[in-house]
Amino acid sequence: MIENNKGLKFYDNLDLTHSHNDEDLQDVYKEWAAAYDHDNDNLLGTVSQPLSVQIFQEYIKDKSLRIIDVGCGTGLVGAELEKGGFSNFDGIDISQEMIDIAKQRGYSKLFIGSLNDSLPCENNEYDAAFCVGVFTHGHVGSERLDELVRIVKPGGIICFTINEGVYESYGFNSKIKKLESENVWK
């Protein structure tokens, strides 16, 4: 049986980490992987993954697009993409334990990598990218939006969430405005 408050302990550990240190994050997710989905559904509220895919589907009708889920974790976005009829999506995460769970969720390919580094992807390799739950406390800063732009084809879609607690302090507001003013995206 999973402790009712254990997920909050893991989440608090992430909030306190603030270091953008992948080794610290890997340690937390290694321990949390088995209970992650339960904790998101029952304690933290899984809303961003299904909502992100729902909004994506309102604009994208081509189910054959090549998609990458950056920071795929246990594959919550992948499960929603699969429900929506998409079948050509890959995932990348820093945690092998999370990827092991994601293997059951329709991904074409899963691999280890971190958005804090260059992703093992070609320039313009994907039609779309998801990055849900990654831009948050102690994970990844705003400068890494450039890496998502690099791997998505011109005219492609990048669907991401940002924790409101880091929107200003991690520089997302200014980075998004800069990318818009430079016509990198709209």
Predicted regions and their residues:
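N-terminal auxiliary segments of SAM/dcSAM-dependent transferases
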Residues: M1-D22
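Conserved SAM-binding loop and adjacent beta-strand
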Residues: H38-V53
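A short beta-strand submotif of the Rossmann-like class I SAM-dependent methyltransferase core
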Residues: C131-V134
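Conserved beta-strand signature within the Rossmann-like core of class I S-adenosyl-L-methionine
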Residues: G155-E164
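A short glycine-rich, Lys/Arg-flanked "PGG" loop and its adjoining helix->strand segment in the class I
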Residues: S142-P154
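Conserved Class I S-adenosyl-L-methionine
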Residues: Y170-K186
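A short acidic, Gly/Pro-enriched loop at the edge of an enzyme's catalytic core
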Residues: L119-A129
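Class I SAM-dependent methyltransferase SAM/SAH-binding core
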Residues: I68-S118
